[in-house]
Structures are given as C-alpha cells and as structure tokens.
C-alpha cells in the first residue's frame, strides 16, 4: 500500500492525473481534505485513493483504443491506394512500393475522442509478401482487420485473386506460431460474432455505455443458430472484408463483352460463397462514382472500435452490393440461382467467366513529312522515267464545229473504218424513218439553193461575190434576157410541184427523230 500512498501524493503525481480530477466527482472530497493525512483515518484515505485508481482505469477503458490496423491485399491496379485515399478525402496521391503505410482519422462524437487507425497496403507482387512481418505480428493480430480488394473490371480474376491472397494470410499467420489456446479463442470470437449478427434497427443505442449494455443483453437473450455446412470452414481468426472496386465497369462489360444479369449474379454467388467460408463481409464500391466509400469506413470502425451502423444488407443493386458478416447463408445465395437461364449452378467459374481475347493493337508507323524540294525532285525523276505516251491522253487534233461535234474529213473516213469497234448486239435499233427524213431535207435544201441561185442571176441583182450581175455561175451573165425570162417559168412550176408533194406526204418525216445536221450539210 506504500505505492498507493506515493501515487496519492500530489507532489509526485503526474500533472495529467491532477488536472483530470480537478473537476471530477471526487473534487469536493479532495478539497475538504477528508481523504488527506490530516484526517487521521488511514483506512478512509486508502479507500479514497482506491476509488481514484478505479475511476482512472475506467476512464482509460472508455477512450478509443489505439493500435488498430487494417491490412489491404490485392492485385496491382485493383485500386487499394485509391480506395484509402478517397476515404481520407485526398484527390492527388502517389502510389507506394512494397509495403505502404497510411492512416485513417477516427472520431467518436459521443465520447468527444479521436484516434488513428493504421492502414497497411501490401504490393500486388507476391515477391513482397515477406514484408507482412512489419504489419502483422503476434501482438497486433487481435487488432487487425484484413481487407481483400478485387478488381471488378476484370471479373475473370476475382476468384483466383481472393483465394491467392487468403492463402497468403493463412501462411503468414501460421508462421507467427500463435499458441493454440489463443488462436482457438480468436476463432471462437469470430464464430460468435458471425452467429450473433442482428439486423440494425432504429432503436439501436447511441451511447457507448448503453451500446455495451445492450449488446450484452442481446447476447444473453438471443438464440445462437448453428453454422451452415460451408460457413467459416476457413477460419483465420481475423475479421475479413472483401471489397470489389471499379464496379462502374459493369456497364462496360455489358456493352463490350456481352455480359448479362445472370453473369453478374453468377459472379456474386461465387464471391459470396467465398465470404461464407472465411466469415467475411462484402462491399461493392466505385471510387470513380464515389459509391459505398463511406460504407467501407463505417464498417471498419464498427468492426475495430464497436461503432454502430444502421445500414442493412443491399443485394438488389448489382453495382452497390453490401453484405455484412453474419447476414448471408446458402439459402440467400440460392435466390441468385433462380435467375439463371443459360447458366447452371454446378458450372465452373473459370469456364463461364473467361478472359476475353486480347485485341492486338497495331501501332501505326509514324511518317515524317519530307522537305518540299526533296519531294518535288523525286516526283520529277519519276515523271522523267515514264514514256511520253503514258503521260496523258492523246490530244484530238480534229477540227470542231460551233455545235461541239468534230468535223471528220471525207478522206479520213476510209482510214478510220478499221478502227471502229463493232456495235454490240444489244445496242439501240436504227429508226427506219430517219432515211426518209434526211432525203426530204436534202430535197428542200436543193430547192432553196436553186431559188437563191436563180435570184442572184436576175438582172440588176447583186452577185454572190458582191459585184453587180455576178451569179453563182459565171456564165449566167452572158445569157440573153429572153433566155432568163424563159427560165423563170419552169422554176415557179418546180416550186408549186415541190410544195404540193410536201403537203401530200407530211408523215414521211419521223416526228421523234431529230434532223441530222451532218447529213443535210453533206447533201
């Protein structure tokens, strides 16, 4: 009891202890001196200091504990660091190497107390698994929560990743050589927490003292149900949380890889079976869409610090699933199997959820533009090597009339006949009325030409060449006037005869066939 006396002496007591009880429930007794040596009652003084020690220990127990740890395991690129940084509220960060250390600030508003939760992130390469000895040892084993992170943008790796990292934890725990009695106690605690899970209600107490009392009463009154055949068959003695990240990629899997709802139900059923074997919880998250990030933090502090949470299980939304440890069982997982249409329950995960074929990305060769002068010199050399006939189309030197059609000389007709290709059998037939129309046009042309020639040959009329008395034929001026007058009568008779013939046969010209100017000029 001498030690108690030394602690009770304010001269030698720590300043924190004196300041703690300056306004405590025993302040009046200390101020009145009823517990001091001047009272002369040693027994009452010893009882007083015993009460002080008990209250100090009670207050120390009511504060938030320190030394709690979260260990994150998963493949490279699964989003482990991104998840913790988002919980911390940090946008920009740098990924560590090997074993990364972070922390979470934990604040209890009811107790007005805060502490830090240690976060260890192991590299995705198995080469670094030896670093687990710095984050998970025999002393910190009881205060550690294991978080297995799965990348849902690559669901074909989900099951293998979970089994691989769970085996890494099991191997490391076995190397710690924990006494069997202590390990058995940790396993039994995990089983008890799984069996005593209760759906969160609205009347859940908020005060820490009331929480502890209510939890103890629930444990005393509740009936513990036996575990299922596949439940906690791989008990690590540690609370486990499975976090599926990048769940926003579910829509991409539907569009690009033809995933359907039954595929996602199939994936979820296998992950939930794994969680049953290890007694783990399951949360689907998305850092990109900030989905269920706060839920991960709330579940961590609930498991490590006993904070309450009022969030029930969510299984309806395929990209925001939340299944706390102790809620799930084989019957609830069987509900997912009812939606299977083309899949079967006994199908292997690797046979259904396969890795899509890798599309080879062909890198196009970067082309550097040449100098303009070098390019023009190469082009000039290429043009110089080509023969002149191949440089372009031969120019048509035949003369053209104002209408646009070339006039072919008569002398070249015979030479060009051999070069004309034969007319195909399916070409358009020649209109038989075209010849008759061309003949009548020729007659009309001859008729009007004769009129012009006769008119120019009349006395006093201008000649063709512009000289008076000049006709189409030079001999017309030498004829006597009597001969000219006698020649006019046959011309008039020819005009009347021609007009009568045209009037009697108007249908000889085809109305649909346009006159050929080439033939008229030739006649």
Swiss-Prot record:
Biased amino acid composition, Gly residues: 458-473
Q: Where in the cell is it found?
A: Cytoplasm; Chromosome, Centromere, Kinetochore; Cytoplasm, Cytoskeleton, Spindle pole; Recycling endosome membrane
Using the record's annotations, give every residue carrying the modification Phosphothreonine: 213, 408, 512-513
Q: Where is this region: Disordered?
A: 1-45, 387-434, 457-523
Detail which positions bind ATP. 74-81
Q: Where does the record place Low complexity bias? A: 412-421, 474-483
Sorted alphabetically, which Pfam families does this protein's record hold?
DLIC (PF05783)
Q: GO cellular-component terms in the record? A: centrosome; cytoplasmic dynein complex; endocytic vesicle membrane; kinetochore; late endosome; microtubule; recycling endosome membrane; spindle pole
Provide one Gene Ontology biological process annotation. Answer: cellular response to nerve growth factor stimulus
The family database entries (InterPro entries) matched by this protein are listed as: Dynein1_light_intermed_chain (IPR008467), Dynein_light_int_chain (IPR022780), P-loop_NTPase (IPR027417)
Concerning PTM, the database record says:
Phosphorylated during mitosis but not in interphase.
Instruction: Please list the residues that carry the modification Phosphoserine.
Output: 207, 398, 405, 412, 419, 421, 427, 486, 510, 516
Predominant localisation class: cytoplasm
* Gene Ontology molecular-function annotations: ATP binding; dynein heavy chain binding; GDP binding; identical protein binding; molecular adaptor activity; protein-macromolecule adaptor activity
Q: What does the UniProt keyword field contain?
A: ATP-binding, Cell cycle, Cell division, Centromere, Chromosome, Cytoplasm, Cytoskeleton, Dynein, Endosome, Kinetochore, Membrane, Microtubule, Motor protein, Nucleotide-binding, Phosphoprotein, Transport
Q: How does it assemble?
A: Homodimer. The cytoplasmic dynein 1 complex consists of two catalytic heavy chains (HCs) and a number of non-catalytic subunits presented by intermediate chains (ICs), light intermediate chains (LICs) and light chains (LCs); the composition seems to vary in respect to the IC, LIC and LC composition. The heavy chain homodimer serves as a scaffold for the probable homodimeric assembly of the respective non-catalytic subunits. The ICs and LICs bind directly to the HC dimer and the LCs assemble on the IC dimer. Self-associates.
What is the role of the protein in this entry? Acts as one of several non-catalytic accessory components of the cytoplasmic dynein 1 complex that are thought to be involved in linking dynein to cargos and to adapter proteins that regulate dynein function. Cytoplasmic dynein 1 acts as a motor for the intracellular retrograde motility of vesicles and organelles along microtubules. May play a role in binding dynein to membranous organelles or chromosomes. Probably involved in the microtubule-dependent transport of pericentrin. Is required for progress through the spindle assembly checkpoint.
Task: Kindly give the PANTHER family that the UniProt entry links to this protein.
Answer: CYTOPLASMIC DYNEIN 1 LIGHT INTERMEDIATE CHAIN 1, DYNEIN LIGHT INTERMEDIATE CHAIN
Family under the similarity heading: Belongs to the dynein light intermediate chain family.
What's the name of the protein?
Cytoplasmic dynein 1 light intermediate chain 1
The protein's organism comes out as: Rattus norvegicus (Rat)
